[in-house]
Amino acid sequence: MSAVTQVVETAIGCVIPSCIEFGSSMRIATSLGSPSVTQSPCVNRDVEDIARTARESIRFFLAELSIECVPYTQDPALEAQVASATRCWPDRERLAPHIRTGIVIAATAYAHNSLATRTLIALYTAIGVALDEPDILESANAIGFHHSLCTETSERPSAILDEWRRILARMWDHFPRFGASCILTSTLQFLNMTMLENETKGKVLNRTAMPFVEYRRMTDGFPEVYTAFIWEKGRFPDVQVYMQAIPNAMRFINFGNDILSFYKEEAAGETGTYIHDRARLTGLSSVETLREVVEETVSAWRQVCEILGEGIARDAWNSFVRGYVTFHVHNPRYRLSELL
């Protein structure tokens, strides 16, 4: 997610972000520059071979989900609300690409939520994505953020973190107590892991460190946050309706991004990814690992569907999945138009 988000106009006038990322996993989005052991043999494969592998896996993935993506359409009401809310943000020009990212993810994956909730999601995402960039994170002085929440101090957080804190405080107005608390704790985990990643770049993974790779993947990409966003309090006040689906929904969010990012990462020769780290530590090729991840992600999706059963909670999940995939498929950053 360290890439600068750009916005392009399509021939029919739809605005589509070309470099969206929301979180490591959104690396929604994603690997936060995971440490590498060595270059994967997949990097040197012919681009056509990479494309063939990715095409087969992604087509299988989408077919299993029965996803039919629709073109991204703008949400004027959402854009107006976000523009008003961010008008006085500090350093707004620098944050503008990330604000666009927030709008698009809210308009696609969370289209089933109310306008007020979509607006809050867009604002939260804008700052979260911005803080995934090392220079912005450093300038925000995030290192003292966690401690400041537990102490009485006159030292206030940076302007951008203070804005994020105010946004976080509003989560209880839009999500059940459990969901809002998950958003807070997951946010703190993201910041903590992101700072650790920046402090330990180049650290070689121990061959027995697979549990750490899994742990890092679950903490550096907001999966719990973006799962909690699916079910807003106004329509889903009782968390018991969906709570057992949360772990598998988190896996779907993380691994879904890994699958849909695979082609552009392989074509660019990127090796600091979850799939590459997992392949190295398990002794498999990245192609074999991709296929495993696809199977695990489809399984997670099925289990969420089974747990939710029929009804509005399942409808919200289906809407999220369709929008989440659309976010990737119609985003030029992921280069999926070259495959599908």
Swiss-Prot record:
State the Gene Ontology terms under molecular function.
carbon-oxygen lyase activity, acting on phosphates; metal ion binding
Binding-site list for Mg(2+) 2: N257, S261, E265
* Top-rank taxon, per record: Eukaryota
Essential cofactor(s): Mg(2+)
Where does this chain carry the motif DDXXXXD motif?
132-138
Return the motif ranges for NSE/DTE motif: 257-265
Q: Decide whether keyword Transmembrane helix is in the record.
A: no
Q: Which UniProt keywords apply?
A: Lyase, Magnesium, Metal-binding
Has UniProt tagged this entry with the keyword Magnesium? Answer: yes
Q: What single Pfam family name could you report for this chain, choosing any that match? A: TRI5
Give the EC number(s) under which this enzyme is classified: 4.2.3.-
Tell me, in a sentence or two, what this protein's role is.
Terpene cyclase that catalyzes the cyclization of farnesyl diphosphate (FPP) to a single major terpene scaffold whose chemical structure is still unknown.
Q: Which family does it belong to?
A: Belongs to the trichodiene synthase family.
Q: What's the protein here called?
A: Terpene synthase 29
Q: Recall the taxonomic lineage recorded for the source organism.
A: Eukaryota, Fungi, Dikarya, Basidiomycota, Agaricomycotina
